[in-house]
Amino acid sequence: MNFEGKIALVTGASRGIGRAIAETLAARGAKVIGTATSENGAQAISDYLGANGKGLMLNVTDPASIESVLEKIRAEFGEVDILVNNAGITRDNLLMRMKDEEWNDIIETNLSSVFRLSKAVMRAMMKKRHGRIITIGSVVGTMGNGGQANYAAAKAGLIGFSKSLAREVASRGITVNVVAPGFIETDMTRALSDDQRAGILAQVPAGRLGGAQEIANAVAFLASDEAAYITGETLHVNGGMYMV
């Protein structure tokens, strides 16, 4: 998998899965623009990417911010070839206690942003007759999870959105797919007690948590020419926790 000459935009790239994706695409030759919600986060991305790309501040819920970032990318690097929608948040609560803003924040950040970003890069991809759009979903989007009705709805929505868009643009050489992680090793999971960790692992036939690099590898495959005939799919990376 060689991405020489390709421009990749990865949202939410300051740490965790987003950083692993950005570093993996850069290591394989892409120029990577990673985004963060703060200037400090954007600078951190610039620091780790070095000559392989740049960090920019982006509010994925703001159309003006999206257009500004894309203008900067066009001016310095060119049109986006690979879009990785990774930015996301959680606002967990039981439905009976969930406030409207907790619902709306998740839908805007985790779902509507994918619509806006995908639309913003689409014209150039169609003109080139080539493009890759990969969105980071979640196992919760297919199996559900108590206390996450908002998050699960958004992640399920990503799947329907991606399937529909895939049908619209497949004839132009553009693929649209979802990678749905299960439990992934993060700072949060590392802070769990032994009992809490055991409870999670009991749900995973593989007997371990996944790594951010394993998600990045899946994204890199879907972004590659080797995956040119795969579109409208959701690739589940969850150690057997949920099998579709």
UniProtKB/Swiss-Prot annotation:
Organism phylogeny: Bacteria, Pseudomonadati, Pseudomonadota, Gammaproteobacteria, Enterobacterales
Residues where Ca(2+) 2 binds: 145
Record-listed substrate binding positions: 138
Membrane-crossing residue ranges in chain numbering: none
UniProt keyword annotations, A-Z: Calcium, Fatty acid biosynthesis, Fatty acid metabolism, Lipid biosynthesis, Lipid metabolism, Metal-binding, NADP, Oxidoreductase
Family: Belongs to the short-chain dehydrogenases/reductases (SDR) family.
Protein name as catalogued: 3-oxoacyl-[acyl-carrier-protein] reductase FabG
Organism: Escherichia coli (strain K12)
Segment forming the signal sequence: none
Residues noted as binding NADP(+) in the record, renumbered to the chain: 12-15, 37, 59-60, 86, 151-155, 184
Subunit text: Homotetramer.
A Pfam family assignment: adh_short_C2
Regulation: Inhibited by cinnamic acid derivatives.
Domain of life: Bacteria
GO biological process, one term: biotin biosynthetic process
Pathway given in the UniProt record: Lipid metabolism; fatty acid biosynthesis
NCBIfam families assigned to the protein according to its UniProt record, in alphabetical order: 3oxo_ACP_reduc, PRK05653.1-1, PRK07231.1, PRK12824.1, PRK12826.1-2
Keyword Lipid biosynthesis listed: yes
GO cellular component, one term: cytosol
SMART domains named in the record: PKS_KR
Active-site positions on this chain: 151 (proton acceptor)
Note from the entry: Calcium ions stabilize the structure, and may inhibit FabG activity by obstructing access to the active site.
Function of the protein: Catalyzes the NADPH-dependent reduction of beta-ketoacyl-ACP substrates to beta-hydroxyacyl-ACP products, the first reductive step in the elongation cycle of fatty acid biosynthesis.
Catalytic activity: a (3R)-hydroxyacyl-[ACP] + NADP(+) = a 3-oxoacyl-[ACP] + NADPH + H(+); 3-oxobutanoyl-[ACP] + NADPH + H(+) = (3R)-hydroxybutanoyl-[ACP] + NADP(+); 3-oxopentanoyl-[ACP] + NADPH + H(+) = (3R)-hydroxypentanoyl-[ACP] + NADP(+); 3-oxohexanoyl-[ACP] + NADPH + H(+) = (3R)-hydroxyhexanoyl-[ACP] + NADP(+)
